[in-house]
């Protein structure tokens, strides 16, 4: 079995500002260790193939949800669907895929239907405490977030396709990237997004607007602070009520209270250019939620940070196509056992699982 263990971050590669500390030297202190599971997930049924995997989530049953882009398969990948068929394999899988812990596909659905506007480019998925499934999109016309039951029944749409009115508008979105629902208040936090530069909050039941803010808790575009870049790529709640927001292009994680009060920020791999270093984050599931995991699709690492101060402890993964390597790692999620799941876009087109192997000295 191929093993990918957490690798210690190099000094200076990932520095934190505004309340965070510098990275540890290789081998300093304990950190979580991981081993890639090359057999997860199982092959899809029905001759299906996964396209770009643009979101991944774990629900309260420890099932893993992937939103993928069927239209990103090339002709040779979907050769069985051509007329006449080019090859024996394959056909695009439905956009929304639910896997059990063994990696078996247990449910699939998605696509355009009555009463809602399915995104042109799928992007981001979250499953809330009531088993509702939320999705977004990032095409130039995708300015909506959709809510479904786990069976795929449509429930709610926030925003409208092809309608966006900027950061000050409270009824429209701007290419929303991802979302998170607070089980304590049933509020929906949206990372908005690829066009807008803010976090916006709605009632998850009614879709009523609650509040929004930009970088440092200021109004979007406030010249007194460094604004969020595009995209604002994630918004992730911890159990203590802190909200972690991915300012991807600026290589930083900003931390807020749920009311938008700015707390601190962490900068990860500050020299990173291109697509930036902070694509998605999730927290560990130990009682204090000690660790913060950061998917870095430009450097193709998953960084492990101490959640209280942003200090980088370790990383795993590198650019490549083998099990445990990444090409444009786009999202991640953590299950109740501490296992980490990742999703890759561009030509990566896969989901992977990394088994949690306890906390110990990290390996170089």
Name every feature range the model reports, one short phrase each.
Residues 15-23:
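Short, low-complexity disordered leader/linker segments with a strong preference
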Residues 5-16:
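Bacterial N-terminal signal peptides
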Residues 22-364:
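Eukaryotic scaffold repeat domains enriched in small/polar residues
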Residues 1-2:
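N-terminal secretory signal peptides that target proteins for export/translocation
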């Amino acid at each position: 079995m191929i093993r990918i263990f957490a690798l210690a971050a190099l000094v200076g590669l990932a520095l934190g500002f505004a309340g965070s500390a510098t990275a540890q030297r290789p081998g300093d202190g304990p950190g979580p260790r991981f081993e890639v599971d090359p057999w997860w997930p199982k092959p899809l049924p029905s001759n299906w193939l996964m396209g770009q995997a643009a979101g991944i989530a774990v629900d309260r049953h420890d099932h893993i949800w992937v939103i993928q882009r069927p239209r990103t398969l090339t002709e040779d990948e979907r050769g069985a669907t051509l007329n006449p068929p080019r090859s024996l394999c394959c056909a695009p899988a439905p956009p929304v895929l639910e896997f059990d812990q063994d990696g078996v596909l247990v449910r699939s659905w998605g696509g355009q239907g009555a009463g809602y506007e399915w995104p042109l480019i799928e992007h981001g998925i979250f499953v809330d405490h009531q088993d509702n499934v939320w999705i977004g999109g990032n095409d130039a016309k995708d300015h909506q977030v959709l809510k479904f039951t786990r069976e795929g029944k449509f429930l709610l749409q926030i925003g409208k396709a092809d309608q966006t009115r900027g950061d000050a508008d409270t009824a429209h979105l701007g290419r929303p990237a991802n979302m998170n629902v607070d089980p304590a208040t049933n509020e929906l936090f949206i990372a908005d997004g690829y066009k807008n530069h803010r976090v916006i909050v709605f009632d998850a039941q009614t879709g009523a607007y609650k509040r929004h803010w930009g970088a440092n808790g200021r109004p979007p575009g406030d010249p007194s602070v460094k604004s969020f870049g595009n995209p604002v790529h994630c918004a992730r709640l911890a159990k203590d009520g802190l909200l972690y927001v991915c300012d991807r292009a600026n290589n930083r994680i900003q931390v807020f209270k749920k009311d938008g009060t700015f707390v601190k920020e962490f900068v990860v791999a500050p020299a990173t250019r291109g697509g930036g270093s902070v694509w998605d984050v999730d927290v560990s599931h130990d009682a204090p939620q000690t660790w913060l995991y950061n998917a870095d699709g430009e450097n193709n690492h998953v960084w492990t940070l101490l959640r209280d101060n942003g200090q980088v402890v370790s990383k795993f993964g590198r650019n490549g196509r083998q099990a445990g390597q990444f090409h444009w790692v786009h999202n991640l999620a953590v299950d109740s056992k501490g296992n980490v799941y990742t999703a890759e876009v561009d030509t990566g087109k896969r989901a992977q699982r990394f088994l949690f192997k306890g906390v110990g000295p990290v390996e170089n």
